[in-house]
């Protein structure tokens, strides 16, 4: 049986730390002038993948 291949796009977007999968936040790359500093700071805060999607992400990362 051949080796499982890691999804390269997923490997760049997600990092596995202990039991949680870290992810980036959307809506923070451009058109930032109309967004308040508080909103931009909240977008910079670390986020985690929801537990209902965790199995799908782990299978893309070949860790299921």
UniProtKB/Swiss-Prot annotation:
Any one Gene Ontology BP term: translation
InterPro entries linked: Ribosomal_bL35 (IPR001706), Ribosomal_bL35-like (IPR021137), Ribosomal_bL35_CS (IPR018265), Ribosomal_bL35_sf (IPR037229)
UniProt KW Ribosomal protein keyword: yes
GO molecular function: structural constituent of ribosome
UniProt keyword list: Ribonucleoprotein, Ribosomal protein
Name of one Pfam family that matches: Ribosomal_L35p
One GO term describing the cellular component: cytosolic large ribosomal subunit
Family: Belongs to the bacterial ribosomal protein bL35 family.
HAMAP family the record matches: Ribosomal_bL35
Biased composition (Basic residues): 38-53
Disulphide bridges: none
Organism: Helicobacter pylori (strain G27)
Protein name stated in the entry: Large ribosomal subunit protein bL35
């Amino acid at each position: 049986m051949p080796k499982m291949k890691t999804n390269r796009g997923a490997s760049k977007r997600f990092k596995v730390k202990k039991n949680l999968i870290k992810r980036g936040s959307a809506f923070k790359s451009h058109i930032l002038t109309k967004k308040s500093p508080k909103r931009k700071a909240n977008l910079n805060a670390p986020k985690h993948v929801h537990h209902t999607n965790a199995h799908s992400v782990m299978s893309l990362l070949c860790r299921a």
